[in-house]
A protein has these predicted regions:
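Basic, alpha-helical terminal appendages of large translation-related enzymes
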Residues: 1-4, 48, 120-125, 129, ...
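Structured secondary-structure scaffolds
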Residues: 1-47, 94, 99-103, 129, ...
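A non-catalytic, amphipathic alpha-helix used as a structural packing/dimerization or gating element
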Residues: 31, 69, 73-80, 106, ...
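Short, charge-patterned binding micro-sites
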Residues: 49-55
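A charged helix-plus-loop insertion that forms the helical arch/lid used to bind
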Residues: 59-72
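A broadly conserved sequence feature marking short terminus-proximal activation segments
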Residues: 70-126
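Short functional micro-motifs and their immediate structural scaffolds
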Residues: 135, 152-153
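Active-site-proximal binding-pocket segments
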Residues: 265, 326-329, 333, 339-342, ...
Length: 508
């Protein structure tokens, strides 16, 4: 029986069209989902859109359309962008879905019945863009600590979730489960900035707008975003707090990995675990808060006029060029930076020079020197063994990196093999071997290159699926499974295909 693996991304808020920075976590999650499928896991990959709230109600009014029409348009746009990025999600969810609304309402009712939700009055500070409440001490220079924009005074009747009752439980759970929140620096922020000072009860309903799921027993209130949006991870699996849950829920929950942006870690690492605890459910196994993608070292925002859209880059440079930049050039644990110059440099340096050039040269030599017919001769010189050992080390290295969500590191290890192959060509000088009529040695060199490319490309399928498929086509092989990377020499003497440029250099 295959092991199950459930990975989710944060659902995208449908107040506006997604920009390049919004695509980062879904592409990261896609790599992990594809990799786990290659490993034989039964993967469930969920993503989607968060479609309720005050900001959406205001945006719809500005556009003179109903909120449902507004979110329909944005959700369709998000799905199109995710599809254009070649993401392999299993379910694209929307919180305006009728079944989700029914189950989220039941979750709210269940928490109320248990005494974990009570009615009160809120008076304090509120950020409309983030839909977050703040205390004076949490502000940064008088503004929202998440987005930096001004907050406003707010006063209204609402229902509160008794998060303050669970500070000790949450602290003990986090400390008792290393790896539950990663990276470690983010875990420390959650503990030191929020849990140790003492959690405040959380406002979980609103009365100042109507675009949301009504509270079933109090029609003046709508369920606030945190119970509505966070519950998507279980409602779309068929969790029902009042009756039998679905087989799908029993199969995949708890989630193996919540992939989210660092700006929403507070909600996933504090409120979500407490909600699950109150419902008597298991915790997700890991919550990973990834860094941001910045534009010229500044956060992307419409107000700053520095928005870049993924679909524009895809139409200009191709989907795998965009995926590569997101996956390779944003370092583990720190914010990445986008400029068009950096993007083009990465394509030229990594994809055209290292990667495309290697495949083109290798296939070209196989056809030129042996009319495309290469045989496996297992007699290795020291320089061969160094290459082979590096290639065979990929399996354990990438497994470790993927399990630790070090995606950029893992992709660079694949690139290291391609770079080493280029160096191997310089070291072995195939053109000299041909000139000196050392054809057996020449055959071995070219075979080692082909097999090294093939094995590295088996892993590449998780990162750049279209490019990987094209390489296998040019190598004329279908030996592309994970069990074929454990032993060097699986390439089976096919008549190799014709070389075709994978990536072209871009002139600035």
């Amino acid at each position: 029986m295959k092991d199950n693996f459930y990975i989710s991304t944060a659902i995208v808020y449908t107040s506006s069209k997604p920009h390049l920075g919004n695509t980062y976590d879904v592409v990261l999650a896609d790599v992990i989902a594809r990799y786990k499928r290659l490993r034989g896991y039964d993967v469930y990959f969920q993503t989607g859109t968060d479609e309720h709230g005050e900001k959406i109600e205001l945006k719809a009014r500005e556009n003179n359309i109903l909120p449902q029409e507004y979110v329909d348009n944005i959700a369709s746009c998000v799905k199109d962008v995710w599809d254009s990025l070649n993401t392999s999600y299993d379910k694209f969810v929307r919180t305006t879905n009728s079944k989700h609304k029914e189950l989220a309402s039941k979750i709210f009712d269940k928490l109320y019945e248990k005494g974990d939700i009570y009615k009160g009055n809120y008076k304090g500070l509120y950020c409309v863009p983030c839909e977050s409440f703040w205390t004076e001490s949490q502000l940064v220079s008088g503004n929202c600590p998440d987005c930096g924009r001004p907050v406003k005074e707010a006063s209204e009747e609402c229902y509160f979730f008794k998060t303050s009752n669970y500070s000790r439980w949450l602290y003990d759970y986090i400390e008792g489960h290393p790896g539950f929140i990663e990276p470690e620096s983010r875990k420390n922020e959650i503990i030191n900035n929020f849990i140790k000072p003492g959690l405040q009860d959380l406002c979980v309903s609103r009365t100042t707008f109507k675009w949301g799921i009504p509270v079933s027993f109090d029609s003046n209130h709508v369920i606030y975003v945190w119970i509505d949006a966070l519950s998507n991870y279980i409602t779309f699996l068929g969790y029902d707090p009042c009756g039998p849950s679905s087989l799908e829920f029993k199969k995949y929950w708890p989630c193996d990995l919540h992939m989210i942006g660092k700006d929403i870690l507070r909600f996933h690492a504090i409120y979500w675990p407490i909600i699950l605890h109150c419902l008597g459910l298991e915790m997700p196994k890991k919550i990973f808060a990834h860094p941001w993608l910045l534009f010229s070292n500044d956060k992307m925002s419409k107000s700053k006029g520095n928005i870049v859209y993924a679909e524009d880059l895809i139409s200009k440079y191709g989907v795998d060029a965009v995926r590569f930049y997101l996956l390779h050039d944003i370092p583990f644990g720190s914010d990445g930076n986008y400029t068009e110059e950096l993007f083009i440099d990465s394509i030229n340096t990594n994809l055209a020079n290292v990667f495309g050039n290697l495949v083109n040269r290798t296939i070209g030599m196989a056809n030129k020197y042996f009319s495309g017919k290469i045989t496996n001769i297992k007699e290795y010189a020291d320089v061969d063994k160094e290459l082979v050992d590096l290639v065979l080390s990929l399996d354990s290295k990438i497994e470790n990196d993927i399990n630790n969500v070090r995606i950029s590191d893992s992709l660079d290890k694949i690139m290291e093999v391609y770079r080493r192959c280029n160096k191997y060509i310089d070291e072995t000088e195939p053109w000299v071997l041909y000139k000196e009529n050392k054809l057996d040695r020449l055959n071995t060199v070219i075979y080692n290159l082909i097999e090294s490319i093939r094995i590295a490309t088996v892993f590449l399928q998780a990162y750049l699926p279209d490019t990987a498929n094209e390489i296998f086509k040019q190598l004329n092989t279908d030996i592309n499974t994970m069990d074929s990377v454990l032993e060097f020499g699986q390439y089976n003497s096919n008549m190799i295909g014709e070389a075709s440029p994978l990536f072209k250099r871009i002139e600035k």
